[in-house]
Structures are given as structure tokens and as C-alpha cells.
Regions:
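Alpha-amylase-like alpha-glycosidases and glucanotransferases acting on alpha-linked glucans and related
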Residues: 4, 8, 22-23, 32-37, ...
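Hydrophobic or amphipathic alpha-helical targeting/insertion segments
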Residues: 104-131
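Short, solvent-exposed loop/helix junctions and linker helices
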Residues: 47-51, 95-98
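N-terminal basic, low-complexity leaders that serve as flexible interaction/assembly modules and, when applicable
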Residues: 2, 9-15
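Aromatic-lined carbohydrate-binding/catalytic grooves of carbohydrate-active enzymes
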Residues: 19-25, 29-35, 60-103, 113, ...
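Short, acidic/polar
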Residues: 48-60
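Residues that flank catalytic or metal-binding motifs in active/ligand-binding sites
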Residues: 10-12, 84, 111
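Hydrophobic faces of well-ordered beta-strands that scaffold small-molecule active sites
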Residues: 12-14, 69-71, 115-117
Length: 171
């Protein structure tokens, strides 16, 4: 049985959707045209918030009494919410990449703040290279057992009753 760490008992969490929280001057805005910060959110658009922007606002969050940040997914993805991961080894460049994440962690820890990630490991984006390897190589792919396939849908299995959707992975 897993026990809850002691620090969680008194933690005050603040959930952050990085793309919509704060845009810094570090943002690599040459990668994409961002929506206006003041325009209504578009489910397929990007506002350009990044992890440097989160780090720049840690004092404000600390003043609110926040002791732990819960970040929505930050790994590389083609969607603004980043639940459709295609690279499990790298923080999305639009969020500032791995360097921005390291910077945020260092700054948060200096302020005695914890950082928790929403890790999405039970499904992947259509852009996940191992998924493409299976589509291209079928049963000859070394990754064929990583996914559930519906023989009537070569693009993958239904997700939450909707199609198309992220592809479920075997864990």
C-alpha cells in the first residue's frame, strides 16, 4: 500500500494550464502565431503561455499561500492542453522546453514550493512515432503490443466512445 507523503497533508495546490496562465518574454513565438491573450479561448488555438511565465509569477502564487503547483501536461504535443503526447522525453518547445522546466523547478524549490505533473501515459497522439511504426509495419513492429487495435479501424481504438481520439496504450 502506498502512503501519502506528509507534505501533502497541509499543501495548498494551484492547478495551472500552462498555455493559458502566463506568457513570458522568453516565449519562442517564432514557432507559432498565438491567439490574442484577450480573445476568447479556442480549443485548437494557442495563447502562448509558457513555463518561464509560470516561474515569473511564483512570488504572486506564494503570496496567495500556494505551496504546490499542479501542472497540466507539459510534454510535447500538437494540442494546447497537451493530453495528446507525441514525445514523452521532452517538454513542449512552445512551453520553453526542458530548460524552462528546469528553471521553473529550481525557482519553485527555492521558494519551498512543490511541482506535480499531470503525466499522461495511458494514451498517445497520432504523432507518437511508435504508433506510426505499428501502422507502417503491422505485426512486424516491435511496438505492436504497446497499443490496442480494433481491426475495423486501422487508426486505432475508440477513446471514451468517440472517434477519432488519442490512442490507448497498454501499460
Amino acid at each position: 500500500m502506498t502512503t501519502t507523503p506528509d507534505w501533502v497533508q497541509d499543501a495548498i495546490f494551484y492547478q495551472i494550464f500552462p498555455d493559458r496562465f502566463a506568457r513570458s518574454a522568453h516565449n519562442p513565438n517564432d514557432l507559432l502565431t498565438f491567439e490574442s491573450w484577450d480573445s476568447p479561448p479556442n480549443p485548437h488555438g494557442f495563447k502562448g503561455g509558457d513555463l518561464y511565465g509560470v516561474a515569473e509569477r511564483l512570488d504572486y502564487l506564494k503570496d496567495l499561500g500556494i505551496t504546490a503547483l499542479y501542472l497540466n501536461p507539459i510534454l510535447a504535443s500538437a494540442s494546447n492542453h497537451r493530453y495528446h503526447t507525441f514525445d514523452y522525453y521532452n517538454v513542449d518547445p512552445l512551453l520553453g522546453g526542458n530548460a524552462a522546466f528546469r528553471f521553473l523547478l529550481d525557482q519553485a524549490h527555492k521558494k519551498n514550493m512543490r511541482v506535480i505533473l499531470d503525466g499522461v501515459f495511458n494514451h498517445a497522439s497520432r504523432g507518437f512515432w511508435q504508433f506510426h511504426h505499428v501502422l507502417e509495419n503491422g505485426t512486424g513492429s516491435a511496438y505492436k503490443d504497446w497499443f490496442f487495435f480494433d481491426p475495423e479501424r486501422l487508426n486505432g481504438k475508440k477513446h471514451w466512445g468517440a472517434y477519432p481520439g488519442p490512442h490507448e496504450q497498454k501499460l
